[in-house]
Regions:
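Surface-exposed amphipathic alpha-helical segments
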Residues: 90-124
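Secretory pathway targeting signatures of secreted, lumenal, and periplasmic proteins
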Residues: 2, 7, 13-61
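Short acidic, gly/pro-rich beta-turn/loop elements at beta-sheet edges
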Residues: 22, 65, 99-100
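Short, surface-exposed beta-strand/loop micro-motifs that present aromatic residues
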Residues: 73-82
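Short, Gly/Ser/Thr-enriched beta-strand-loop segments that form substrate-interacting elements
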Residues: 57-74
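Short, isolated positions in well-ordered beta-strands
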Residues: 12, 87-88
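Solvent-exposed, polar/charged alpha-helical surfaces in well-ordered, non-transmembrane soluble domains
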Residues: 12, 16, 111-114
């Protein structure tokens, strides 16, 4: 049965390779013009929880600040809120594991994250 992640204005079908091995952590960062919210998605591999992807949400003022300071920001943007005031970015991590077996697991989980491109819905 397909499970859905639906929290903090983000919705997507959880990839089969993540089922039963999935942690989403909501975080708030910074203040003022640098404040933003992020949801970090991790999976357990070996003895560690390993970050797989991050979806961040930036208000208009914060978005302009981030775009000015990071040339990659615009490339990572995948959606805006319905009112156009919140900008969402998607970052797929590229971690290196200590063992070949753990790396194969990570690569499978990362590929599942990449398959979400274009399938993540912003609900607000």
């Amino acid at each position: 049965m397909q499970k859905t992640y639906d929290a903090h204005d983000i919705r997507f079908d959880i990839p089969a390779d993540w089922q039963g091995n999935f942690l989403a952590e909501y975080q708030q960062h910074g203040e003022g013009d640098t404040a933003y919210e992020a949801t970090v998605f991790s999976c357990h591999i070996g003895q560690n929880d390993v970050m797989v992807m991050t979806i961040a949400a930036f208000g208009e003022k914060q978005w302009e600040t981030i775009k000015a300071s990071s040339p990659d920001a615009a490339k990572m943007e995948f959606a805006t809120s319905k009112d156009g005031k919140t900008h969402y970015t998607l970052r797929i991590e590229d971690q290196k594991m200590d063992t070949e077996a753990d790396q194969k697991v990570y690569d499978t989980i990362r590929a599942a994250a990449q398959s979400l491109s274009g399938k993540i819905t912003i609900t607000k």
